[in-house]
Each structure stands twice: as structure tokens, then as C-alpha cells.
Amino acid sequence: ECNLIDVIQSSEDEVPVPYQDIPGAPYIQLPIDLQHKYKKESTLSLFKRIGKVPNIEDLFDELVTSPNVFHYRNKMEYGFSAIGYDRINKTDIDIFTLGFKRRGVWWMGDNLEKDSGLFDALVEDNISTIRKYCEATGLAPWHGPKREGFFRYFVVRKSYKTNQLLFNLVTTSLDLPQFDLNAFSKLLQDI
């Protein structure tokens, strides 16, 4: 087993996409046919290796794809962290983050600065606004190794039928009286 440390040269198969790269979408820069191929191979391999299903190909019917190549998820969970990833220096830094955890590192956050291509573009383009608001409250983001902090997760669900959003801010309870829920709700309604 091995862990990816750094990509020195991108694949010649990659195509430019206008989205921020995130750990949960390692194939997004590949054409959709290659994405499907690699996802199928990876899934079947996991069933063989971890599930101990040696004849998985005989049991597998077909890959069912989404009708949308981008913006197809109806739920996203963004994590807060007091330890962030510095993309320029490729190291961890003490910073208020809201976005995704770095691949393979449960305690380090990576800020989402723009649309990832997976969820609602309007929401994701405003995650940095939400992060700045939360940081300005003076309440701390979650610090995994220390197991302390106020802000834990920001979960968003989208109904594609009604085009409505449901927001869930997950916090610890200790500093809850210091958090202005009405002002935060107004921020979300104005987005």
C-alpha cells in the first residue's frame, strides 16, 4: 500500500476544468468516459480485495451513471478546522478553514474557495463568505488533535425538484450562547 505525496506531472489525459480541485473528486479533470472506467475498475478491485468477492465481474451488471457530469450531488458536508493546508508551501498552517479534509489527513482542512463542480455552484462560490463570517464571530473552528473548538461541520442538502436548500451547522454546545443564529440565518438567506 502507498500514499500519494505529490503530483509532479499531470496526466496527458487531463482536461482543464473551471473547478477547484478537492480530495473527494480525484478524477474530475479526466474526460467522463475515463472517469467511469477508473471508477468501475476501482470499485471492482475493492470488492475483490476488501470484500473477498473473487468473481465480482460475474456478479456485476452495469455502471449506472448520473445524467449530469457536474453539479450532481444533493448533499455536501464541509468541515471546519483550525489546522489548514498551505497549497503554496505544501504544509500545514494554523488557520480557520472551511472546506474539505486533505486526503489521508483527518485533522487538516483545505479551504474551498470556489465551486468544486460536485454540488450547487452558488453555495460553493459562497463558502468563503460563510467561512469569513464564522471566523469574524471569534469562535474557534474544530481543532482535531486537541478535540476542541466550536464550529464542526456545515452540511447542505439540495432538493433538485423544488430548488430549495437545507442548511445544518454542526457545533459544540459550550459557546452556543455566544453565537447569533439569527444573523447567521440571514447571511444564508441572502446568498
Task: Please name every model-derived segment.
Residues 1-191:
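Accessory RNA-recognition modules of RNA-modification enzymes
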